[in-house]
């Protein structure tokens, strides 16, 4: 085997004579390794990997150059320095597009309304709503998502045109629909613009909407183009799996961010019977540690916070409520549809918002909450509409709390005389008087009128009568006797007017054969005449419902009052 010949020594200097000669094939091998890297990819593989990217870059650059050279804009260029007397206007998108748009769907704003475009003065920022410029024609184009990322507002017309995108080779037009819009009083709407291709084929994977005028404006007015926020365009097949903002209670749990349909989180939650957003939120409220363990102990704080933030943007159902009584029966909780405590009542008093509680009350509530969350099956559904009406806000039906003793026993005027009533009734002159000793507080009594705080509480025997204007509750047979089982006879609700000179008050009028409770009150601010509640009229809804509520409450305590009156009569020998 013959070795390669070396260069002769006499033809070179002393330095070159000492040079180590390397065979030619080894030189080529070292060069190839330097280019490809030791153990790197082959040249063909590198070409195959770089070719698509190079094609896109070359295609975009060549297309922009051809478009700017072959189709020069007829509009005045923003590269020119505008004269001091010239006017500068600009188009502007008012609404933001959503972060993700699907092919085949109309482009809409985040709130679901059409995207609006307005023409404003660049100096005063006032909208141009009159003149010939307020009705110019505008063209909608698609821009590369990288355009405007530096937040520059002084781009040139050529820069804007160079960022306009066209469809990929062999594809349909990138956008279809009404791409030319005529402004009306300086305002236009993007009603029917549809993407036909996704945005995954460009480097930033995002598009922007752009708007530019179609025809050149007269005079020295320059109108700058408008650009929208960047957004992604995905294939319409992904719309079936899109997230909801905000999510709804009945949405499946995979509608939440970071929970993929049929993914690991979804399967773990389904195994624990957490199928909807409502189930997710209920478990989050009652036992957040258990929820996080279901998702996996290794879940990062960032992923956890993202899921929780999206879930908490859900709006609870205002018509679904629950109550829970504590073990001591002193605290009653009012919970919403996801088991959050919204109001609390103590000893049957009015419901109070949680934020208005004292420190000691909050301790009691926390203890009751722990009991409730351990026994969620003991929560009682509570339909507030059955008591307060469907159209009345919850807080509107909570009058100022007043102590029962202050309301009923301020003026211990329990007289039994039978004076001549202003109602014109024929009554006997039999009379009696007594005082109540150690009266039991009556819970839940609230005034119908502020004047009732100083009103007396009278018990007078009368015969049944007919009156055009009355507010009466005909009670049970045997009221005032020792009968325990009663049967309501009639509930008559009509508009009430003052019938006595002492002011607003309650009058107990027991008849010894058939007793009745005449419930009279006056509401100067809400006066109605000779009309029943069911008729169409202008009334004060709050006062009307307060009347009904008070009547129902008086019905619930009438039995105890009758027993005490019976005992007093027996002690004084009034009856046998």
UniProtKB/Swiss-Prot annotation:
Keyword Manganese: no
Molecular-function GO terms, alphabetical: calmodulin binding; DNA-binding transcription factor activity; sequence-specific DNA binding
Biased composition (Basic and acidic residues): 8-25
Pfam family, one: Calmodulin_bind
Disordered: annotated segments: 1-25
Keyword Transcription regulation recorded: yes
Family of this protein: Belongs to the plant ACBP60 protein family.
Protein name, as recorded: Calmodulin-binding protein 60 B
Species this chain originates from: Gossypium hirsutum
């Amino acid at each position: 085997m013959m070795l390669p010949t070396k260069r002769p020594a006499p033809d070179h200097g002393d330095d070159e004579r000492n040079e180590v000669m390397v065979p030619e094939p080894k030189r080529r091998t070292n060069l190839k390794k330097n280019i490809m890297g030791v153990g790197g990819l082959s040249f063909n593989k590198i070409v195959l990997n770089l070719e698509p990217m190079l094609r896109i870059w070359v295609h975009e650059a060549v297309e922009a150059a051809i478009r700017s050279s072959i189709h020069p804009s007829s509009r005045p260029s923003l590269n020119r320095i505008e004269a001091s007397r010239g006017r500068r206007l600009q188009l502007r998108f008012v609404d933001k597009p959503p972060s993700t748009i699907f092919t085949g769907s109309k482009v809409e704003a985040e709130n679901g309304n059409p995207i609006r475009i307005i023409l404003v003065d660049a100096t005063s920022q006032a909208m141009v709503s009159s003149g010939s410029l307020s009705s110019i024609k505008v063209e909608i184009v698609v821009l590369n998502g990288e355009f405007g990322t530096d937040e520059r507002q002084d781009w040139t017309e050529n820069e804007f045109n160079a960022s306009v995108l066209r469809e990929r080779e062999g594809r349909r037009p990138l956008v279809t629909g009404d791409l030319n819009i005529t402004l009306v009083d300086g305002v236009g709407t993007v009603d029917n613009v549809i993407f036909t291709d996704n945005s995954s084929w460009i480097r930033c994977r995002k598009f922007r909407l752009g708007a530019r005028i179609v025809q050149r404006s007269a005079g020295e007015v320059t109108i700058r183009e408008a650009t929208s926020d960047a957004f992604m365009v995905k294939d319409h097949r992904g719309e079936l799996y899109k997230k909801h903002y905000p999510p709804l209670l009945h949405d499946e749990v995979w509608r939440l961010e970071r929970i993929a349909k049929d993914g690991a989180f979804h399967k773990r939650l389904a195994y624990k019977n957490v199928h909807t957003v409502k189930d997710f939120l209920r478990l989050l409220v009652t036992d957040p540690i258990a929820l996080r363990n279901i998702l996996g102990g290794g879940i990062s704080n960032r992923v956890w916070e993202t899921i929780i933030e999206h879930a908490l943007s859900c709006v609870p159902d205002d018509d679904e409520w629950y109550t829970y009584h504590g073990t001591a029966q002193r605290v009653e909780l009012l919970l919403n549809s996801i088991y959050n405590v919204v109001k609390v009542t103590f000893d049957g008093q009015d419901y109070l918002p949680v934020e208005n509680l004292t420190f000691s009350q909050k301790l009691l509530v926390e203890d009751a909450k722990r009991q409730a969350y351990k026994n969620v099956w003991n929560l009682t559904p509570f339909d507030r509409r059955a008591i307060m009406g469907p159209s009345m806000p919850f807080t509107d039906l909570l009058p100022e709390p007043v102590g029962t003793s202050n309301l009923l026993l301020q003026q211990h005027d329990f007289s039994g005389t039978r004076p001549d009533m202003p109602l014109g009734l024929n009554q006997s002159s039999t009379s009696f008087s007594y005082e109540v000793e150690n009266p039991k507080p009556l819970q839940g009594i609230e005034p119908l009128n502020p004047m009732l705080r100083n009103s007396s509480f009278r018990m007078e025997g009368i015969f049944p009568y007919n009156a055009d204007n009355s507010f009466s509750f005909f009670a049970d047979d045997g009221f005032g006797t020792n009968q325990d089982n009663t049967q309501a006879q009639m509930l008559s609700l009509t508009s009430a007017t003052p019938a006595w000179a002492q002011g607003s008050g309650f009058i107990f009028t027991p008849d010894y054969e058939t007793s009745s409770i005449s419930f009279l009150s006056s509401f100067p601010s809400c006066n109605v005449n000779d009309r029943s509640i069911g008729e169409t009229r202008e009334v004060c809804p709050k006062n009307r419902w307060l009347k009904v509520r008070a009547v129902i409450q008086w019905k619930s305590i009438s039995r105890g009052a009758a027993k005490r009156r019976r005992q007093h009569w027996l002690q004084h020998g009034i009856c046998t």
